C-alpha cells in the first residue's frame, strides 16, 4: 500500500478525478452530464471538476484527505463524448461509488449530483442528462406504493387506458360546485377526476369542504354506474403535518386515491407520503408542477428522464409525462423513453430515445404515465398509439369544454377511447385511420359527434425546445 503524504496547495482536478481507464462497477451510480465549460477550461478539466465537486473534492488540497480512502470514495469522470451538432458543450460520464449515498434517499442523491456543482464557476452551464441507478440502490428505495397491476385490481379497470379530467376553472369554484363538476364527469363515463396542482386549501375552497363534496360525488357516481371511480385529492400542504392530516381524512372518506405535487412539495415529503399510501392502501397520483423550470433548458438543469426515475424511486403510482400531441413540451422519442423508464422492469440504453444507460428496476412496480395538457377527442388515436394501455389520458377543457356540458364531454371521451381500443385490437393503424375510426364511432354517439366538430381546428403545432441531441453514440 502506497504511503500517503500531504502536499498543501491547489492542483488540477484532472490529476485526481479524471480516470479514462476506469471501468464502472455494477454497483456504481453513473451520471451523464452535459457540460458547457468556461472559455479556456478544457474538457478533461471541466469533467474532472464536476466529478470532484459532486463527490469528495473541494478547491484545494486538505490534509484530512489522509484520514480516509479517497481513491475509493471519489467520483471519477471516465468518459467524454461529443454532443451531436453542438461543439460548445460535451457529455461527461461520471461514476460514483454507491457508499457515497444514503440508502433509499433520493434527497441525498440529488444533493450531491445537482448540488453546489451547478453553481461552479469553471462551467458556464451544466445539465444532468441521465443517471443509472444500480439494482443494489434500487432495492433500498420504497418505490411506487402499489404500481400498475395493483391499481388495475383496485379500480377493476383492464384492457385499456384509464380516463381522467382535471376540474376547471382550476381556481375559483366553491367546494359545492366543484363536487358537482366531479359528479358530472364521473357519471358521464370517466374513471377519475383531478384537483389541479394549485388547488390546496384556498379561502374559496377549504380542503375539508372540498374533500366532503368530492366524496359525495364519487360515491353517488359509483352507485349509479356500477363502476369504481376516483378523484385525485391534492394533499400537498404547507407542512408535512398538514399533508398527513389531509391524507388521513381522505382515507376516512374511503377515497381510493390522493395526489401530491412532488417537486414543489419536495422529495422528503413525497417519499414519506408514498410510504403512508402503501401502508394505508391508498393510491398516489403525482403532479410534476415546476418541472419545466428545471428541465426545459437544453443546456442547464436536470432532464425530465432523471426526474421520472427519481419519482419512481421516491414513490408514486401516476406521473404526468406530457402528451406529445397536446399543448405542453414533449418530443415523441424522448417521451416514449421516459414512459418506458416509468413502466418497464428493464430499459436498455437507447441513444435514439436519449437513454444513456441500461436501467434495471428489478421487481419494483411500474408507474402509470399520465398524458395531460391540451388534449381532446381528435388526439385519442395518437395517444393510444403512443402510450398504449398502461396510461391515463387526463383531459380538462377536452371534457369540460363540450358544448353540452361536462357529462356529455365525458361520454365523448369514453366513446372515442373505446372505439380506438376496439380498432387497435382489430389490428387497424390508429394514426393512419384515426379520423375514420372516430367519425364512424360518432354515428352512434351525438356527444362524440359534437366534440369532433367543436375541436376539429384545434392544434398545438409549436416546435420542441428541448430536442434530442443524441443521434449516434
Curated annotation (Swiss-Prot):
Residues annotated for Mg(2+) binding in this entry: 194, 196-197
Keyword Nucleotide-binding listed: no
UniProt cofactor note: Binds 1 Mg(2+) ion per subunit.
EC top class named in words: lyase
Record carries keyword Ribosomal protein: no
Known cofactor(s): Mg(2+)
Entry's Gene Ontology BP terms: reductive pentose-phosphate cycle
GO molecular function term, any single one: ribulose-bisphosphate carboxylase activity
EC nos: 4.1.1.39
Positions carrying N6-carboxylysine: 194
Record-marked site positions (Transition state stabilizer): 327
Alphabetical keyword list: Calvin cycle, Carbon dioxide fixation, Lyase, Magnesium, Metal-binding, Monooxygenase, Oxidoreductase
Protein residues bound to substrate: 116, 166, 170, 288, 320, 372
Active-site positions on this chain: 168 (proton acceptor), 287 (proton acceptor)
Transmembrane spans: none
Record-linked InterPro entries: RuBisCO (IPR033966), RuBisCo_large_chain_AS (IPR020878), RuBisCO_lsu_C (IPR000685), RuBisCO_lsu_C_sf (IPR036376), RuBisCO_lsu_fd_N (IPR017443), RuBisCO_lsu_N_sf (IPR036422), RuBisCO_lsuI (IPR020888)
Catalytic activity: 2 (2R)-3-phosphoglycerate + 2 H(+) = D-ribulose 1,5-bisphosphate + CO2 + H2O; D-ribulose 1,5-bisphosphate + O2 = 2-phosphoglycolate + (2R)-3-phosphoglycerate + 2 H(+)
Pfam families: RuBisCO_large, RuBisCO_large_N
Family: Belongs to the RuBisCO large chain family. Type I subfamily.
Subunit structure: Heterohexadecamer of 8 large chains and 8 small chains.
Function: RuBisCO catalyzes two reactions: the carboxylation of D-ribulose 1,5-bisphosphate, the primary event in carbon dioxide fixation, as well as the oxidative fragmentation of the pentose substrate. Both reactions occur simultaneously and in competition at the same active site.
Other information: The basic functional RuBisCO is composed of a large chain homodimer in a 'head-to-tail' conformation. In form I RuBisCO this homodimer is arranged in a barrel-like tetramer with the small subunits forming a tetrameric 'cap' on each end of the 'barrel'.
Protein name (database record): Ribulose bisphosphate carboxylase large chain 1
Native organism: Acidithiobacillus ferrooxidans (Thiobacillus ferrooxidans)
Gene it is expressed from: cbbL1
